[in-house]
UniProtKB/Swiss-Prot annotation:
Homodimer, and heterodimer with bis1. Keywords: Membrane, Nucleus. It is found in: Nucleus membrane. Has a role in maintaining cell viability during stationary phase induced by stress response. Activated by the spc1 MAPK pathway. It comes from Schizosaccharomyces pombe (strain 972 / ATCC 24843). It holds the Pfam family Ish1. This is Stress response protein ish1. It comes from the Eukaryota.
Length: 684
């Protein structure tokens, strides 16, 4: 309540200031109605006065009594007068007058705007009144994006005539901004016969030499332009009516605003300018419609159609070799941007087949080795039984025929040696075949994977990463090499060699672990280390120290270091800090978002590692052929095939175990025979 009283007092003081500053000079220029209104609202009797001169004389004579001389008033009189002028009823009355005046002004402006908008909508809707339903459907199917799809064209058949016209009028707004206000595209769905029929229906004569489409369109445009010109007076009348309403609203405000006249006049002026601006814009738009001057099918240029046909593989006439060349370029660009997914899917399928083939071959090799082992074991068992029987025969025949016993013992010994040699050869051949086949399959799988993705990934690698790739494979790198030269070398040696396990070991370590390793072994290195503490340079320092140790240091130190290498596969990244991960991604040329996702970063690094490492030179299954195939399978997206890759590793190990068992069985059989032969010889 207190804030309201203060605000009201401020309004009242502004009114008093206005009266003291300008006096009644404004009302001396106005008509008597304004003076009467002011006197009545302030409860000042004016008697029978009616003419302007009477009121001017009355105001001049009574000026001192009407305008209080506050300087001469006592404090009591001032408080009394201000109390009356700050009563809530008095202030509410002033506020109500201002609100009513504002509403009337707003209503007048809205009426003017609505009248202009109605005239425009009526003019726009009349454009499609004479169209048939089929013409409207063809127009919308051709130009409206919401009905462009084949499955949505059936919706047009269900729309009523009124809905078709309403939809066409709405689409017209969007199309005019896109294709131009008055282009011939509006009628490009009409046939020549439909144009003639329409002109005939509206009474436009067509002579025999005006039968071409260009003549028909010109006739149609002239007719519409004439009708638009005839409607121009109506548009001007609407504008005049709106202006008159705005003027009347301004006069009404001038009559009713009272002491707030200055404020309301300002609002009236702003609203009048806004209304005038909108009416002017509406008039200009209607004027544009009346011109009806547009283009003749320029939107469907031959070059645009050819470009569309070329990109989508549609045969189009190419008059010259250079046109054929550009058509080929457009086709290749489309395949690169839109056909890449199909090509990549095909590569995935091929890599999947390679993995299946690897598993099948290894399984067959293992089966063959198992059969060889079983044959060797069975033969050894039979030979053992035969050896026992023969030994008994030798002992019993000792008294009868000494020479015969000696001959049989020699035969048994020769047979055991022959059987052991044959079994060992078969098992060895099976194991060698399994290892050779698995190596070929792994190489083929690696080649297929890399052929699929090297062009899209390695080009993002930094120069330092490309040099490291070549360095770890023993490929000499020129001192000054450009990015293109490095890429050529990487592509050339992509499927050659493998990363040594000591390099793989260092790449599994975080920057903290690398720093600790360097601190422990740098005493064996007398060269200069890079001072930077980022992971890239720490890795280079560790490699330099290891090579120095391998060349000169004590063998016990080297063996201690190398004992950890067979455990190295590829980086697991679990112990790496976020800064290490970001540094590694930066080396691979991957972007790092504002919000760092650790899990996503690790996945991206593992995908790059498939290309960078390949099969790591080590004896463990995880870092050898089987591990590489599993990582390839995971990267290519067919994780369900992991069982096949695991089985491949198991089958290879089974071949090795089978060879060991077969050799052991044959050796045992040979030892048994040898023992019994010696016993027989001692007896003899």
């Amino acid at each position: 309540m207190r804030s309201r009283s203060v605000a009201s007092l401020g309004v009242l003081l502004a009114i008093v200031f206005y009266i003291f500053t300008y006096g009644f000079s404004t009302y001396r220029k106005n008509d008597t109605s304004a003076v009467k209104t002011w006197l009545e609202e302030h409860s000042i009797p004016y008697g029978s006065r009616s003419s302007p001169s009477d009121f001017q004389q009355f105001i001049s004579e009574s000026y001192d009594s009407l305008v209080p001389n506050l300087d001469k008033w006592s404090g009591h009189n001032l408080n009394s007068w201000l109390g009356k002028k700050t009563e809530s009823s008095y202030l509410d009355a002033i506020s109500n007058k201002i609100r009513k005046t504002g509403r009337k002004l707003s209503g007048s402006v809205e009426d003017a705007r609505d009248a202009t908008q109605e005239a425009w909508e009526s003019q726009k809707a009349s454009l499609f009144e004479s169209w048939s339903d089929s013409q409207l459907r063809a127009f919308l199917a051709r130009h409206s994006p919401q009905f462009a799809a084949k499955e949505k064209k059936g919706i047009l058949e269900k729309l009523s005539p009124a809905s078709l016209r309403e939809t066409a009028a709405k689409e017209y707004d969007a199309l005019t901004s896109k294709l131009g206000n008055t282009g011939d595209w509006i009628y490009d769905t009409w046939s020549d016969n439909e144009l003639r029929t329409w002109l005939h229906d509206v009474g436009v004569p067509i002579s025999s030499h005006e039968s071409t489409r260009s003549h028909l369109l010109r006739k149609l445009k002239n007719y519409i332009s004439t009708k638009a010109d005839e409607a121009q007076p109506s548009v001007e009348a609407v504008k005049g009516k709106a202006s008159e309403k705005a003027k009347q609203a301004g006069e009404f405000v001038s009559d009713k605003a009272g002491d707030a006249k200055e404020l309301v006049n300002e609002k009236s002026s702003e609203a009048g300018q806004y209304a005038g601006q909108k009416m002017e814009e509406g008039g200009e738009l209607l004027q544009e419609i009346s011109k009806r001057r547009g283009r003749f099918g320029n939107w469907w240029a031959n070059s645009g159609l050819k470009a569309y046909f070329d990109a989508h593989g549609i045969p189009a006439y190419q008059p010259s070799p250079i046109d054929q060349f550009y058509a080929h370029l457009r086709r290749q660009y489309y395949l690169k941007t839109n056909g890449y997914q199909a090509l990549k899917s095909k590569a995935y399928e091929e890599a999947s087949n390679v993995a299946d083939s690897a598993s099948s071959i290894a399984s067959n090799v293992a089966s063959g080795a198992t059969e060889a082992y079983q044959g060797a074991a069975s033969g050894a068992s039979r030979f053992t039984e035969g050896a026992k029987t023969a030994a008994e025969s030798v002992t019993s025949a000792f008294e009868h025929n000494k020479d015969t016993a000696t001959s049989k013992a020699k035969q048994m010994k020769g047979k055991a040696a022959s059987l052991g040699s044959t079994a060992s050869e078969k098992v060895g051949e099976a194991a060698d075949y399994a290892a050779e086949t698995a190596s070929k399959v792994a190489s083929k799988a690696a080649s297929k994977v890399r052929e699929t993705i090297d062009e899209t990934i390695i080009e993002r690698w930094q120069d330092s990463k490309l040099k490291e790739f070549l360095f770890l494979r023993g490929v000499p790198v020129p001192q000054r090499s450009t990015k293109d030269q490095l890429l050529d070398l990487v592509r050339k040696h992509f499927n050659k060699g493998a990363v040594p396990n000591w390099a793989a070991y260092f790449d599994t370590l975080s920057s903290k672990e690398l720093s600790a390793w360097i601190k422990e072994y740098k005493k064996h290195y007398h060269g200069k280390l890079h001072p930077s503490k980022d992971r890239e340079h720490l890795f280079q320092n560790a490699c330099n120290i290891y090579r120095a140790i391998a060349e000169k240091a004590d063998k016990s130190v080297l063996q201690s270091i190398q004992s950890k290498f067979p455990k190295a596969t590829v980086p697991g990244y679990d112990s790496w800090s976020n800064e290490d991960l970001k540094s590694a991604l930066k080396e691979y040329g991957d972007s790092i978002g504002k919000v760092f996702n650790r899990k996503d970063a690790i996945e991206r690094l593992k995908r790059h590692d498939i290309l960078f490492y390949g099969p790591v030179v080590a004896d463990k299954a995880k870092s050898g052929v089987s591990g590489f195939l599993r990582r390839v399978a995971s990267f290519m997206g067919f994780g369900t095939r992991d069982v096949a890759e695991i089985k491949l590793g198991e089958n290879i190990q089974k071949v090795k175990d089978t060879a060991s068992k077969a050799s052991s069985a044959v050796s045992s059989a040979g030892d048994y025979v040898e023992t019994n032969v010696k016993k027989a010889q001692r007896v003899l």
